[in-house]
Amino acid sequence: MSKLKIDTKRRFSLLIALVLIISLSSCATTQTNVTAITTKTVFNQETTYHNLLKLKKWQANGVIGIIYDNQAESANYTYLQDGDNFSIKLYGPLGIGSIEIKGDTNSVSLANSKGQKLTAKDAKTLMLEQLGWYVPVEGLKYWIKAIAIPNIRQTSELNTNNLLSKLSQNGWSISYSNYQLVDSKYPLPTKIRMSRDNLTLKIVIKSWQI
């Protein structure tokens, strides 16, 4: 076989491989259908709350910024929630490699890229010990959907769409912006700011999968 035919065959193989990689990447980043919410759209507050409360399973992907004790860090994240089970993967410029926090109502574990795994009764204790900061996972499964934890005292403000713009609950002050309609039913935020004491979390949600 001539060199020209070999080169042509190699190029064809590389082209097929490239197409497969692009296809797989597209599948990996596919998100649930989203549409913009106009300023004229006004949601029924009670209906919206109950729809979001019933939403028990999702995946959110994006970037989180952490400010604590005059330090600042950031990371990419993938957050999965399925009922009471959750998984938060953090990776990127954290300075500690990638980590995954998994848990349910009974226990929480933290695994790092070195293969080390630690367990505790709650995520706050584990994250403070290992990272120096924490994500309030018990409340986050509600707050990331822009709803309050049921049956716990809270104060809130609504925007012109009748969606949460501010929420204070469990000692946290939370603000929301840039909502989008996911799956033609769920108005979900793309930017969240959470503050308590000397800790501030800035969460950008780039995609929702439900």
Curated annotation (Swiss-Prot):
Lipid linkage positions (S-diacylglycerol cysteine): 27
GO biological process terms, semicolon-separated: lipoprotein localization to outer membrane; protein transport
Protein's membrane topology: Lipid-anchor
Signal peptide: 1-26
Intracellular or extracellular location(s): Cell outer membrane
N-palmitoyl cysteine: lipidated positions: 27
UniProt keyword terms in alphabetical order: Cell outer membrane, Chaperone, Lipoprotein, Membrane, Palmitate, Protein transport, Signal, Transport
Gene Ontology terms: cellular component: cell outer membrane
SUPFAM superfamilies: Prokaryotic lipoproteins and lipoprotein localization factors (SSF89392)
Keyword presence, Chaperone: yes
Manganese listed as a keyword: no
Function of the molecule: Plays a critical role in the incorporation of lipoproteins in the outer membrane after they are released by the LolA protein.
Subunit structure: Monomer.
Protein name listed in UniProt: Outer-membrane lipoprotein LolB
Organism of derivation: Francisella tularensis subsp. novicida (strain U112)
Lineage start: Bacteria, Pseudomonadati, Pseudomonadota, Gammaproteobacteria, Thiotrichales
Gene transcribed to yield this protein: lolB
